[in-house]
Swiss-Prot record:
Component of the large ribosomal subunit. Mature ribosomes consist of a small (40S) and a large (60S) subunit. The 40S subunit contains about 32 different proteins and 1 molecule of RNA (18S). The 60S subunit contains 45 different proteins and 3 molecules of RNA (25S, 5.8S and 5S). This is Large ribosomal subunit protein uL4. It holds the Pfam family Ribosomal_L4. It comes from Candida albicans (strain SC5314 / ATCC MYA-2876) (Yeast). SUPFAM superfamilies: Ribosomal protein L4.
């Protein structure tokens, strides 16, 4: 998140004006790379075009199994003779010319649901990350000549209609170096995408966000890597391409001023229904500094000595190891001293003799 309270407005000639704009509250939103990646993966799936293989692919031949008893697999085989194809296996996914396993269908569930508030949270997080210079540089953007981030240009930029004039503005504000990087990055794609309309790959350049389109979209649409978007229709696919935070964004003054009305602030309600701008749970993210502060350490009891837990327990037989036996049964020592185990058990019932039994019968 950015901590500067004021942002300067740059003219289309690259001059820093006297006007200062307060930093919108959305730039104080938490930067959540985990949330941005999760939302991006799901949102990016929603623009896929349905595809499937032909229903009869791999089955356009007459083949039957030979059955058992011929010392070959029971896979269906092409009949006939006079050609190499006869006798070859068919239909199975392991066969040459056979169908694929689980043929793809157009009724696959292509669309993935994303919670509305989760999408808005990720968008706000991506906007906040665009003001952090380290994240913008880490993403690969060339912003060494940019005076400050976020970069705000006067509203005259929205009225530019010629591409050469738009490029001149980019050079004046120090953003053209990023366009040159895009031009040099154009390479032939590896793989079959070359045959499917995706012949080249190139990096992403700056994103220009405007409030009103007075010709800026047509002026910039042919500049390599440069994209345009309305401040009211910002999406995560443009703010964080590839789920990587830190897109280089050029704001027009009108778009920058309307961020508080679009996403809300402490004093302004968002135009998005039922939306509240996310905020940090703690203002200082340096938890180590908080824990080691004098105020916290004054009420925290001192840490005890470190105890190392035994990695494993040595198992011994208590019947053979006397020390282990005494640990399990402390009475075993007295039991052995009294020789209780070797003493004979007293007879509970004495068997009468024959004489005693005869006297009982007489009585």
């Amino acid at each position: 998140m950015s901590s500067r309270p004021q942002v300067s407005v740059i003219s289309v000639k690259g001059e820093q004006g006297s006007s200062q704009l307060p930093l919108p509250a959305v730039f104080a939103a938490p930067v959540r790379p985990d949330l941005v990646h999760s939302v991006f993966v799901r949102v990016n799936k929603n623009k896929r075009q349905a595809y499937a293989v032909a229903e009869n692919a791999g089955h356009q031949t007459s083949a039957e199994s030979w059955g058992t008893g011929r010392a070959v697999a029971r896979i269906p085989r092409v009949g006939g003779g006079g050609t190499h194809r006869s006798g070859q296996a068919a239909f199975g996914n392991m066969c040459r010319g056979g169908r694929m396993f689980a043929p793809t269908k157009t009724w696959r569930r292509w669309n993935v649901k994303v919670n509305h508030n989760e999408k808005r949270y990720a968008t706000a997080s991506a906007i906040a990350a665009s003001a952090v210079t380290s994240l913008v540089l880490a993403r690969g953007h060339r912003v060494e000549q940019v005076k400050e981030l976020p970069l705000v240009v006067s509203n005259e930029f929205e009225s530019v209609t010629k591409t050469k004039d738009a490029v001149a503005v980019l050079k004046a504000v120090g953003a053209h170096k990023d366009v040159v990087k895009v031009i040099k990055s154009k390479k032939l794609r590896a793989g079959k995408g070359k045959l499917r309309g995706r012949r080249f790959t190139q990096r992403r350049g700056p994103l220009v966000v405007y409030a009103q389109d007075n010709g800026i979209v047509k002026a910039l649409r042919n500049v390599p890597g440069v994209e345009t978007a309305s401040v009211k229709h910002l999406g995560l696919l443009q703010l964080a391409p590839g789920a990587h935070l830190g897109r280089f964004i050029i704001w027009t003054q009108g778009a920058f001023e309307s961020l508080d009305s679009v996403y809300g602030s402490d004093s302004t309600k968002s135009i998005k229904s039922g939306y509240t701008l996310p905020s940090n749970i703690i203002s200082n993210t340096d938890v180590t500094r908080l824990i080691n502060s004098a105020e916290v350490q004054a009420v925290v009891r001192p840490a005890g000595e470190k105890t190392q837990k035994k990695s494993h327990v040595l198992k011994k037989n208590p019947l053979k190891n006397k020390q282990v036996l005494l640990r399990l049964n402390p009475y075993a020592k007295a039991y052995a001293a009294e020789k209780v185990g070797s003493a004979k058990v007293e007879q509970a019932k004495v068997k009468p003799s024959k004489g005693q039994f005869a006297e009982v019968l007489k009585n």
